[in-house]
């Protein structure tokens, strides 16, 4: 849609329908719950500044200071209060970073499953085993 940065997201319902334990903390918006897939598309070098704010991967969200620096108090308040839609949130973030950032919906339940603990490692092993069985 003419964006400069694409951020892949999957609906929480999509994940939970296939993997009930697959994602425990989706982002909650006024129009639904979404999980980040940690897959980004950057149109040009000029968009790298927006991506720099998220260096460090999944640990970004665990640092309140980094989240506040990246998004600002008001955007954080809107997010926490669930007053914004997914699209509206990305529009506000776009203004904050000075580039057009848009969500890209991924239809794959597996896309946002990070392997960063025993529970998600088990889910990943189950996914791989099921795919191997299908291929055999």
Q: What are the residue ranges of the model-derived segments?
A:
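Short basic/hydrophobic patches in alpha-helices and adjacent helix-turn junctions
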Residues: 92-102
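Conserved active-site beta-strand element of glycosyltransferases/polysaccharide synthases
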Residues: 102-105, 114
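Short, conserved phosphate/pyrophosphate- and ester-handling motifs at nucleotide-, phospho-/glycolipid
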Residues: 117
């Amino acid at each position: 849609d003419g964006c400069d940065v694409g951020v892949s997201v999957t609906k929480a319902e999509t994940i939970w329908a296939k993997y009930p334990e697959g994602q425990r903390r989706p982002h909650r918006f006024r129009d639904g719950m979404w999980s980040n897939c940690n897959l980004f598309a950057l149109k040009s070098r000029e968009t790298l500044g927006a991506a720099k704010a998220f260096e460090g991967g999944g640990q970004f969200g665990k640092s309140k200071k980094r989240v506040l620096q990246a998004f600002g108090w008001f955007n954080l308040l809107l997010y926490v209060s669930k007053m914004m839609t997914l699209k509206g949130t990305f529009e506000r973030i776009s203004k904050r970073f000075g580039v057009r950032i848009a969500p890209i919906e991924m239809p794959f339940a597996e896309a946002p499953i990070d392997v960063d603990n025993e529970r998600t490692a088990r889910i990943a092993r189950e996914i791989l085993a099921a795919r191997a069985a299908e291929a055999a």
